[in-house]
């Protein structure tokens, strides 16, 4: 784990750890030149298993490839990839706000219907973009409240593209057992669909 104050790639100062996932750690960093806040995702080399024939490193760099193509206000922009001291990193926009999970858990009342519908429409718009803006549909496979950010302007952004992939019409099934229990489709866990 990186300590606050660590300088990466002679460009970024680590401010703090802001997330941990199966594929890696996520840090808030600041650029040395203009003090802009960004996020750096570090590949976790303790991920030993191979998933669907792809190594953790292949999945990690595929995430960067997907993000480099995004041109939607509801998706963070990827700024680059780099290696530092034997570790691989993706640099992307820092999305300010709260996760939908945090909003739900901290609220004593249900999210108002009008607000929930607006967020649902924005999520559908982002998913429509992913499915229809590339040569093959991009399947976002980890939609859950902790991967949905609500910005201070009350706009939706989707984060964490580690298990996205292009739809392959030549395969009988297009899923593998990655995702979050309780949010992935049941057929995904059964190895179907």
Go through the PLM ranges and name each one.
Residues 25:
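Conserved N-lobe ATP-binding subsite of Hanks-type protein kinase domains
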Residues 30-38:
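Conserved N-lobe loop of protein kinases adjacent to the ATP-binding glycine-rich P-loop
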Residues 81:
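Activation-segment/catalytic-loop signature of the eukaryotic protein kinase fold
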Residues 119-120:
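Activation segment signature within eukaryotic-like protein kinase domains
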Residues 85-99:
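Conserved short submotifs of the Hanks-type protein kinase catalytic core
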